[in-house]
Amino acid sequence: MIRAELDKDPRDVAAMFDSIADRYDLLNRVLSLGRERYWRQATVAAVDAYSGELVLDLAAGTGTSSESFTRRGARVIACDFSFGMLRVGAERRGGASRKGVTVVAGDALHLPFADQTFDAVTISFGLRNVHDVDRALAELLRVTKVGGRLVICEFSHLPVQPLDRMLGWGMKIGLPWVARQFSDNPDAYAYLSESIAAWPDQAGLARKISAAGWSRVAWRNLTFGVVALHRAYRER
């Protein structure tokens, strides 16, 4: 079985996501009990992309989330370092540049884009898997235009610690078990539950975003804090 460890070696993480690409979107819906769609809708609303804007959807996976940003006329670059994920998404859309979405292979720590390229940048359920989060946040700032915005949708922590520990225990046991019913690589989902447990809480991530140079950092909880939506701006 292919899985990554919490040191998040980029090659291991990419190989792990390659191995689950074919059924990734289905498993997301099952494991989130259908809440994944609501979380993505909240992310689209927070990005608030409109006609003429260019959006970077980093860690886009199969590009399911990317298509949502095009509904008001924005153009989207779907960037991911898992070739397996990008391949599955391109096959579903009928090409690497279709329906307002252009697929680009890239590393969050070395984004293949010029300074101040994007009006908005966003990453959903992917920042947690990056080897160097601080550097990735700085790279996202670099490629964002002055006045542009950042939206991060990521698993987080319930504000009541005993409940958060119970949820973490349930995910540690439940995610791999459910994944076994649908995936050839359930070990990958053991890594995902471990990475969620090790992730900073809402305030901790907000501090990281501010330290990277972003301004007006704010967040709100989705599903009681199971997921948090952070938003920030590049002011200079």
Swiss-Prot record:
Reaction(s) catalysed by this chain's protein: a 2-demethylmenaquinol + S-adenosyl-L-methionine = a menaquinol + S-adenosyl-L-homocysteine + H(+)
GO MF entry, a single one: demethylmenaquinone methyltransferase activity
GO biological process, one term: methylation
Protein name in UniProt: Demethylmenaquinone methyltransferase
EC number: 2.1.1.163
Entry keyword set: Menaquinone biosynthesis, Methyltransferase, S-adenosyl-L-methionine, Transferase
Encoding gene per record: menG
UniProt similarity note: Belongs to the class I-like SAM-binding methyltransferase superfamily. MenG/UbiE family.
InterPro entries: SAM-dependent_MTases_sf, UbiE/COQ5_MeTrFase, UbiE/COQ5_MeTrFase_CS
Keyword presence, Glycosyltransferase: no
Pfam families hit by this protein: Ubie_methyltran
Residue sites binding S-adenosyl-L-methionine per the record: T62, D80, D107, A108, S124
Pathway: Quinol/quinone metabolism; menaquinone biosynthesis; menaquinol from 1,4-dihydroxy-2-naphthoate: step 2/2
PANTHER family, alphabetized: 2-METHOXY-6-POLYPRENYL-1,4-BENZOQUINOL METHYLASE, MITOCHONDRIAL, METHYLTRANSFERASE
Originating organism: Thermobifida fusca (strain YX)
Function: Methyltransferase required for the conversion of demethylmenaquinol (DMKH2) to menaquinol (MKH2).
Superkingdom in the source lineage: Bacteria
